[in-house]
Amino acid sequence: ADLVFLPIYYTEAAQILTYANRVGYTPKFFGCDGMDGILTVEGFDTSLAEGLTLMTPFDANASDEATQSFVTKFKAKMDGLVPNQFAADGYDVIYAIYDAMTAAGVTGNETAEELCTILEGQFATMSVDGLTGTGMHWDANGMISKAPAAVVIENGVYVPMG
């Protein structure tokens, strides 16, 4: 195969890339957002990820102020660990929930069922700009919609693809 799609998480992907290298198998590898973090796998030869393409809504190397502020604060709290898209997704969803609750005037006196109904209503009509995308919105089933983004690993760093 010329291209191998790996819709798996980064730990397992690192094992596959290591084994492929060991047996001399050199296709182009492509992964999803679960691959974000492959460069941080302990003991993994990150040079094996060179040329790997993956979908991820977050790039810790992005130069915008919001991303750099988040990365700086995250690294300070997490002993220098660089955040991946999972951390950025978590950050975005916390603020999306906060914004939805604020817009709805949630007081804290609502039952869990009432709060769920309120949030469903808010998320059906709101749009969010965050670290992992702009104009993010949710459909009636709660599925998020945001523009896809891809990076390729070059010289050990993520490089956004046009």
Task: Give the location of each predicted region.
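Extracytosolic ligand-binding ectodomains
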Residues: 1-162
